[in-house]
């Protein structure tokens, strides 16, 4: 597999065996490398293939996120799958990593975002909320940041949105909750 573009020391754009551009992640994957170099496939931890326009967005997103946050998001996703038996789509690797980065950025700046739907999330999505609380423990242990219970609710929504084979009534309610969250964040900033 050949490197097309170095995004950062841990993320590169490469050409797969079918000639399609993919984004791959792994500790030190891009360190000391340049376009055209052969990729050390033993260092690859995650591969993402998607439509061309999405590859560019993913590259932009991962360029500015510390690798430790990416690893922590991966650990949270693995926990949700293993501990709670959740089947999650690959998009959660992007959305959860982005959210984690944004949550820590807000915390560092002293910006508090209250989750106005926290009560509903706790009541109607208990399993996802428990996974969200477990995510807070992982963040505290791995990164040293203590995020609020509101963030457990936000993590729960990301997990809920990414679930495959989720109950249809539950899934139908997600767009409404997502819209409410976007409105809350919009009013806050």
Task: Give the ranges of each region predicted by the language model.
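A cross-family "folded-core" feature that marks the main globular domain of proteins
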Residues: 1-189
